[in-house]
Amino acid sequence: MRSDMIKKGIDRAPHRSLLRAAGVKEEEMDKPFIGVCNSYIDIIPGHMHLNKFAEVAKEAIREAGGIPFEFNTIGVDDGIAMGHIGMRYSLPSREIICDAAETVINAHWFDGVFFIPNCDKITPGMLMASVRTNVPSVFVSGGPMEAGRTKDGKNLSLASVFEGVGAFSSGKMTREELLEIEQTACPTCGSCSGMFTANSMNSLMEMLGMALPGNGTIVATSEARHQLIKDAAKHLMNLIEKDIRPRDIITKETIDDAFALDMAMGGSTNTVLHTLAIANEAEIEYDLNRINEVAERVPYLCKISPASDYSMDDVHHAGGVAAIIKELCEIDGAIHPDRITITGKSIYENVKDAEITDDVVIRRKDNPYSPVGGLSILFGNLAPNGAVIKVGAVDPSIQIFEGEAIVYNSQEEAQQGINNGDVREGHVVVIRYEGPKGGPGMPEMLAPTSAIIGRGLGTKVALITDGRFSGASRGISIGHISPEAAEGGPIAFIENGDKIRIDLPNRTIEWLVSDEEIAKRQEGWTEPEPKVKKGYLARYSKLVTSANTGGVMKI
């Protein structure tokens, strides 16, 4: 066993002495040591219940024949961190989570790891650590929040509150109406109830084969999640016995299939960043063009908030992620159904008994919302290395958008401009110097996109940025523009009034300025001074790579 490194032989007597002090009994020294990587944090609704999950996991591990050791990671609540300096720590927290988990796993030579993530950066950070250390692993997330409800029974989510702020500022909603939404949109623990980043990643974990069916959609308050934990613990012990490791499960075909599910469900654009980072840890080279190739063969089957009013709970009762995966298995060439998973069985075997029970919530393959997937990678002279848009959350009437640039050098400036009414129909809002390096930390733009929607401009204004978006963002919102402004990318040289053309069917974004004019503007450009000059963000900005490579850290 891997853990023999710290418990076998005469030289390890001091180590065993410390293990005894930690509560390990003599008869337990020969059993597998299992790390329980938890992310319990009081201030994050998606994590406030995970202390109880860890207790269930540890008991299940003991019953399955292992010895559990719980440790914790940090986490950032993107909703609470939104719109201020806190958001600059969100994406960088992914790297801390990964590094911290790697540190504990390798320092203590665990034989296996039971990961308990939930919200936005925690799930990918933990999976990156799992793949990096390549120790047998299983994942059970904390589960989605129940949807809020209006008095007339309409679903609410956190996105409803953000968009309500925009509606209030433009006079379309009263303070009392906004307060009612604020008080009812987030009624329970769990990750926010729509197809935002957390639920996108937790759903993808099922397709990646690192979590059991139900992981993405069983609500946090359901006892069924406890059974999921118990089942996963048994599978973990089997993985250790058979020496099935994360890199046996995570292959290039697995990454393809993760994007296929993303396309079918119209997942968050952040999944592109995170899945590329996971591929990087698995030493898989993955070209952005491959994502568009996946989109061409996968239909858009399930619209969830913010693209509709359906919640993750609605998806669960319609058959869950498993039913969507099964539907994709029945489309020739859509996914690779024979891939191995943590059950020791193929992805198809995991979902073969799943059924769509509500084909309004989950459409069948012969009646999709669109014959192509809900995410697109755009290329053009404004984004030579790519940009991403959640086309599934764009009004279907918008195929081509051409407008005049209105340029802001920070999210805060843009928010003020939108609130002041400076942004009008026909504008392309440009928010730059907000990329991984320039932000630093590539903050999310949920506040500006929500303000645009709330002011009734969702089909009349586009927003482009080298930053990124919350999974709750919708509309003509294009992020991850690469190279970013801080690296001298084309977005750094856009001026007010420049024409920008977005062609969704052809997946292009073009800056309608002559090459001569672009070259003239680029003359004499120098890299701007970093916004943060001490602490973690200063180090991060020096080491982080571009969005098109997943925003990982250079070694």
Curated annotation (Swiss-Prot):
Cofactors, names only: [2Fe-2S] cluster; Mg(2+)
Binding residues for [2Fe-2S] cluster: C119, C192
Annotated metabolic or biological route of this protein: Amino-acid biosynthesis; L-isoleucine biosynthesis; L-isoleucine from 2-oxobutanoate: step 3/4; Amino-acid biosynthesis; L-valine biosynthesis; L-valine from pyruvate: step 3/4
UniProt: Mg(2+) binding residues: D78, D120, K121, E444
UniProt cofactor note: Binds 1 [2Fe-2S] cluster per subunit. This cluster acts as a Lewis acid cofactor.
Superkingdom of the organism of origin: Bacteria
Subunit structure, interactors included: Homodimer.
Protein name, entry field: Dihydroxy-acid dehydratase
The species this protein was found in: Halalkalibacterium halodurans (strain ATCC BAA-125 / DSM 18197 / FERM 7344 / JCM 9153 / C-125)
Recorded name of the encoding gene: ilvD
